[in-house]
């Protein structure tokens, strides 16, 4: 995401954040603190990073992100969604629901080695993808309740 931010273009290729214990050596209390540190160390200005650290699942991420941007009176025209490749469709679905006028660039990352080509070849990949399917059904029902 920081690379895309710096280049201000999306060409469909992004290497993702590689875990580097010599660069990211702090104790992080939340995922947001870690990701903020990654972005700052990769050239994204701190004032350009919005804080949302209350969500416990993806649909809440979208809801709370919307609250943060509304509170800051920001009209989001374009946004980058950077997430695991098998999670990208569900993530996009939620953010499109909460930000219907926004153009999204989805930047999938194969951070855990699970790809479109190999997910069905091992138990870890199968569990990750079928877990996504289960969460789509469960969280979609929550969306309908709202």
Features from the language model and the residues they span:
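C-terminal capping/extension of enzyme domains
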Residues: 113-146
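A structural signal for short, hydrophobic/glycine-enriched beta-strand patches
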Residues: 2-121
């Amino acid at each position: 995401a920081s690379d895309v931010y710096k280049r201000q273009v999306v060409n469909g290729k992004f290497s993702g954040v590689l875990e580097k214990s010599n660069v990211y050596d702090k104790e992080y209390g939340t995922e947001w603190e870690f990701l903020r540190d990654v972005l700052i160390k990769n050239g994204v200005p701190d004032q350009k990073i919005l804080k949302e650290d209350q969500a416990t699942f993806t649909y809440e991420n979208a809801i709370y992100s919307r609250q943060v941007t509304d509170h800051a009176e920001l009209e989001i025209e374009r946004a980058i969604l950077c997430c695991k490749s098998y999670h990208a469709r569900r993530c996009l679905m939620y953010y499109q629901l909460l930000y219907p006028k926004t153009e999204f660039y989805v930047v999938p990352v194969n951070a855990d080695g699970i790809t479109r080509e190999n997910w069905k070849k091992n138990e870890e990949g199968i569990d990750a993808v079928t877990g996504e399917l289960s969460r789509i059904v469960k969280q979609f029902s929550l969306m309908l309740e709202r």
